[in-house]
Structures are given as C-alpha cells and as structure tokens.
Amino acid sequence: MSVELTPPRSDGSVGFAPVVVPPAPRKPLRRRAVSDLEKLYKVKRRLVFGADDGAVDNDTSNNNSGSSSTTSRSRRKTAADVVSDSPKRTDDSSTAGEDGYTHCVHSCACTPGERHLLCCELVSIGDSVSVARCPLCSLGISTTYLSRGCCRGRSKVTGGDEDEEDEDEEENSQDEDRDEEEAASASSSGGLEWSDDSNSALSWSDENIIISPFPGLKCYVTTFEDIRQPVLLETGSAYLPVYVPYDESFCRNRCLERGGDDDDERDATLIGKGSFGQVWRLSDKKTALKAAASESINETLLTVWISGVVRSRAQDAGYRGELDDSVYCNILVATGSCLRHNLVSFASFDRDLYNYRGWHYAGLASYRRAFSGIADALRFLNLRCGVGHFDVTPMNVLINYDRADDRQIARAVICDFSLSQCHTEGTTGHCVVVFQQTKTVRALPKSAYYLTDIYHPAFKPLMLQKLCAIEPRKQFPKPSANRFCVSDLCALGHVAAFCLVRVLDERGQLKVRSTSEDALFGVARKTCDALARHSVDEVANFCSLLITRQLAYTATLLGSDDMREPMARLCDYFETVSDKDAPDRFRSVYKRARREIDGSYMVRLLLAASETEDGRYLLDNIRATCLMVDSEDLDVDPYKIFP
C-alpha cells in the first residue's frame, strides 16, 4: 500500500496516510480523418450548463445522430481498410480511381495485424511504383509484370461486360509479350533483373534503392548505414523525409522481452496504459516501449517522424542528445521502432506528473524549473519543428526526481505525440517516413485541427473550450505556428495550476484527488464518452461545464478579483451565440464549481508562495495563460509566457 506525506504538524513531526492512487484520466479517442467529418451549418445552440448527465433535446440529438451515421457511411476507406476488408485471393486486383491513383491489393500469408503494413499501396500511374510482394512474409503476386513504372499484367479492372473483359485479356496478352522483350532487354543492359518464374515475387525496391509512391522522391538504402536513430534528412525537394533504421537485434532484445499474451513470458513491466496503447519498462530499467493499441500504424508513423525532425533540428541548433540520444531540448524522442510489433522505444523515466507523490512546498524552485523547461520544449516543437503537441497534460510530462530528496524534480520532459499534428508551412501532406525494415515510404495523415481532436478536455485552453461549447466540430481559429505555440503554452498553464493546487492544499493529495480533481475529471470523462459516441450536443454541454471547473481551479490560486474580466467576456460571448439566459446559467454553475473546488485550505501556503520569486513566477504565468478566453489572445508573443 502506498503512503502519502502529509503537511508537517505543529510539533514538527510528519505523518503518513494510506493512499489509493486512482488511475490517470484517459484522453479522447484517436482523432478522426478529415473525410470522417462533414461541415455543419452554424446554429444557435442552447447551452444546458448544469445538466451533468448530458441530457439534451431529443429532436436535436436525433438530428445529430443521423448526421453522424451519414458521415460514417460516407467515410472514404484508407489503404489499410481496403486490405483488411478484402478476401484473400491468389491474383492481383487493381482498380483505377477518380483521383488518378491505382489501388493495388496484394494477397499474402501475413496475419491481419501484419498485412496492413505494405500489402496495399496507392500507386501513381504516371511515375511511381508497384510493390508486388509483402516485405514481412515475402509472398505476394507472382505474375505481375512491371514496365515504365505502371501496374500491368494480370490486373483485372472491375466493371464491364464479358466481351470487354475478353478484349482486355487479348490486349494484356500483347502487352505482356512486349513487356517480356523490354524487361529482357533491360536485364541485359544492367537494369532490373526479370524472371519468367511464376512463383517469384517482383518489386521495384531492391537492396540499393527504395522507389516511393510519391513523385520526385527516391530514397537510397545506403543512407541507413550512417544513422542509428530516426532522423530527418532533407534533400531539397518538397518532402520532409525521416529515415528510420532497423536492426534485427531490436526484436530480439526489446520486442520479445515484452512477451506475448501470457504474463509469465514477459520480462518487462507494464507502467502505463491508455486509449492509445501500453507502455512497458524493460528489465534494464533504462528503456521503455510503447505498443500501439490498434493495428493502425499511424501513431507509430507520427511518433518516429516527429522524433526524427526534433533530433535533426536540435542538432542543427547545437543541442546535444541526452539519455542515449532520447532527449533533445526537454523533448522525449524515439530511439527505434518495429513495424511488425507496432511499437517504439524511448528512454525510461521515474514517473509522470500525475502519479508523482512528492509534491511539497519545499520543492517549489524545482517545479518552476520543470515548467520553464517544458515551455522551452513546446516553443522549440512548434516554432522550430513545425509540430503542435496538442496534448499537454500531467500524464504526458515525465520526470526523474532527486534521489536524495524526492520532493525535488531533477528532470522533466514532454512526451507522447498521439494527438500531435504537423503545421510545417508549405509541406502539409509531404511529411514522409522511410522505413528500412520494410523498404517502404509512408506519408503522415494530413492535419485537420478539429477542436474535438486536440487536447485532453480537462486541460484544453479556454478560448478553444468555449468554441467547443458552441461548435464542437469547429477547426482551430486562424491556424499559425505562433497560435499553436501559445495554445500549447496555455494548456501548460492549466497543468501548472493543477499541480500547484496539490502543492498548496494542506489537506494532502488524497483529499485533493477525491474533491477538486474528481470535480474536474468527472466532467472530462463524460466528455470523452460523448466524443466516443459522436454525440455533438453532449460534447457541447460538457465542454461548457468544463469551463466552469477550469475557472474554479484558477480562482483558488488567483482569487475572485482576477476572475471578473474573463467571466464578463465569457458571459457576453454566451449571450451572443446562445440565448439571453445563458449568462445567468453560466454564473450559477460556476458558483457550484467554486464550492466543489475549495481553495480555503490553501490560504496559508498560497500567501507564503506569493512572497517568493518562484511562487510569483508560477502564479504570474498561470494568470497569463488560464485567463485567455478569446481567440485573439493567441496572437501574443509566446516567449513572454513561462520565459
């Protein structure tokens, strides 16, 4: 059983109290693709406020559920969906779509969890490549003949009558004869070797070059000889390719240590579990593995791409890697990955801020250094790397504490890019990852910046939270690198307020968790559940309730006087976009939130903290970030926040 250090008694002694640590609040489910969403007409939404159960008008709820089902039916399948939905076949199925791409589906002996890695590619008809085998099991289409970078051979185009199919077969037969002559000629002149063996698989990618499905991008296998971790290697083209090397010993030493479904086979220890996967600490105590929760490799793609960009940009700026090249500028980056097991490796830390047990007034100076360092990391990530973190929470700040005094934080880093999105100007849609393991090139999903897809509901900046209360599917207002950076810093301000309440409340962390934090996370959990159900009206209602909880948290630290202006601006906004009675309902729910999140037990330590330089630094930056309620506030200088 854990114990919690309580505030010193009057006689100077220290007491201990048993603690039952609740699990960390989960974040929203994975963001939806752009094609999963439809534009909604702007309507005046009647804010419910105080309805904690999320009850909404039935007619409105039905309308939105119908919209969600329509959206789901109209969703365009991804390449992975095409493969997983297709029955296993022994021939090549290739169809030409309206977007100018040929969708090539290849059969292989891989499991569904492995098959999505390569067996379906979007192949440009003009100047790209057809991959005719699976790099994992080396099986695939054996009778596909390739010429001039186009998909040919026994590919059947769906549609048409039998006569047209006969004509196509005759034309294909003539094409095959011509292709055989050209291929034999190319082989004799030193080109790609061609074989008429019907059991041999063909691919344009070989031991020397990886030809990608993206026009103008060629990647050479020899590039991997000089790199050991994911790194960005710019070639002057319109692409930002991150090369991810692979060593066979990675699986032997790391993947297999995590073991299978039987816990007895594992040497690793499970230290974290959430919506996006599991985190394991290996037996060396220095390495952690994050295994994705789903078969999709999108999160692995995003993680290794951001890690490569951060590593490259940091080295260019003169930063040196720490902890085996796993930390740059207080950002935790991946040191390796395995697509077969869909996981990435990092350096291991003691714990995260949410599960940290050493909060104490004596550690105030170290907490200031920690938040200042995380702010530097967010500025570097947004302004130098072109990446918005969009998930700044206590659960995503990892720390090592001082072994001599666990009340002091020795090191803090930002981690977890599950909700991150790229905003590199001029290169959106051109961020690609080159994998040595499969000799393939894959692109990151395009960024959409939908407000419901970014940030944990409990720590979402207020100017975005209020927009979600009216239009949950609204996109980020006037996106830019500066605005994204300020938004991340505002989320960091809410995290600082959350942690400072733990430090200053003399009732101890156990009582804070069961009162103030429960009031905040209780509504946040309902918001996540509503997001999973795609219930737009419930999401809007719970976001409006979260605003009052976030303001109440801030008020316990700053006092009522500082809350008057942001409260007045929010009331004016709700009256304009909703109805004239909305401000009264908002004030009523805010008063109830103030009673639930009680700051009366913080008065003594709060006054003491306000008289110290470290305490004033934290309080001033909480004031600068947690009271931003208008989207225009995002245009401030990010270097003036947590400087």
Curated annotation (Swiss-Prot):
Residues 265-643 form the Protein kinase domain. Changing residue 47 to A: Complete nuclear localization. GO terms for molecular function: ATP binding; protein serine/threonine kinase activity. InterPro entries: Herpes_UL97, Kinase-like_dom_sf, Prot_kinase_dom, Tyr_kinase_AS. Serine/threonine protein kinase that plays important roles in several processes including viral morphogenesis, nuclear viral egress, viral replication or regulation of host cell cycle progression. Participates in the acquisition of tegument during virion morphogenesis in the nucleus. Phosphorylates host SAMHD1 and thereby counteracts its antiviral effect by reducing its dNTP hydrolase activity. Inhibits host DNA synthesis by cyclin A/CDKN2A sequestration to the cytoplasm. This is Serine/threonine protein kinase M97. Residues 1-30, 52-97, 155-199 are annotated as: Disordered. The active site is at residue 391. It catalyses: L-seryl-[protein] + ATP = O-phospho-L-seryl-[protein] + ADP + H(+); L-threonyl-[protein] + ATP = O-phospho-L-threonyl-[protein] + ADP + H(+).
